[in-house]
Amino acid sequence: MTKIEDGAVVLFQGDSITDCGRNREIGTDLGRGYALIASALFASKYPEKQVQFINRGISGNRVKDLQQRWQEDCLDLNPTWVSIYIGINDTWRRYDRNDPTSVEAFAEGYRDLIVRTKETLDAKLILVEPFVLPVPEDRKRWREDLDPKINAVRELAREFETLYVPLDGMFAAASTKAPSAYWAPDGVHPSPAGHALIANAWLEAAQA
């Protein structure tokens, strides 16, 4: 049986992968990615639970951006479940804008989100690990920056006993069945098939 309770409010938080073109003017819009797919599959399987899903992902966000809007876009919404998927932009900005985020600052900011959530809400947490695939070729260089951040997220999940969605290994494994670009054309933003992978892994973590 799923861990998600009757009448739950599930909040998806993150960057462009979560945002995925959602209409900001419509508070119930879930975008076109994994948040929509996961919520649709869940709702079709558990209609009696009447679970509400909310998407507040914003394209380009880093951990520090989530920190700045956490009160309004998380705590004030009073969710019973909080799904956090952040980190790839904390790596990307080092390479495209020479604006790096140290692994220490990343972990500290992420910890702050978790602590504030736990102190304010009686909410369960799902942490989604960031991933990158080697398309185009220059993405391979990103591993030195991203890998320690992935480890930081894993350590936080262990420390706070959250649910966890291990995307990096999953996308690597999927890339043995079809080319990396099939799952994420730019190595970062998932294709529809990639979003379906995330949605299924998210539902699995929630035992749904």
Where are these regions (language model features)?
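Conserved active-site regions of diverse hydrolases
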Residues: I58
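Alpha-helical cap/lid subdomain in secreted, periplasmic
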Residues: K3-D6, I37-Q52, N61-A208
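Short N-terminal amphipathic alpha-helix/helix-capping patch enriched in small hydrophobics
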Residues: L30-A38
